[in-house]
Amino acid sequence: MSKKPFVTKEQVEEIVKTYPTPFHLYDEKGIRANAKALKEAFSWNPGYKEYFAVKATPNPFLLDILKEYGCGCDCSSYTELMLSEAVGVTGHNIMFSSNDTPAEDFRLADKLGAIINLDDISHIEFLSLIHISEPTRQEAIS
């Protein structure tokens, strides 16, 4: 499968005349097409949700585009939580997965209503110590 670049060499040369290097160019049309294709591929599963790893590309414009296609944000830091909130992603549209994390990060995740994903059983006790309780069954499924 051959993929055609979304800009030509000539277009990049023109952009360089205006913007200093280095810079990033994003293919908005391609991002939208891929997000739409992913959403359609899993449309058979009404409970499916894609969570974009904010750490991969912490760009609010990209997060906003992905939000339009139903994507949530996978966050692992206070800054990523703040960025997600700034673009209007809150509640169960945030998956917070983090290790060796300060209490304030977990508190913000809890305040935003994020799903807190733990991969270490000792974190359950830590959350209890900082007064973050396990959700009720109803909260967990809503």
Enumerate the predicted regions with their spans.
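A charged N-terminal "starter" segment
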Residues: 1-129, 133
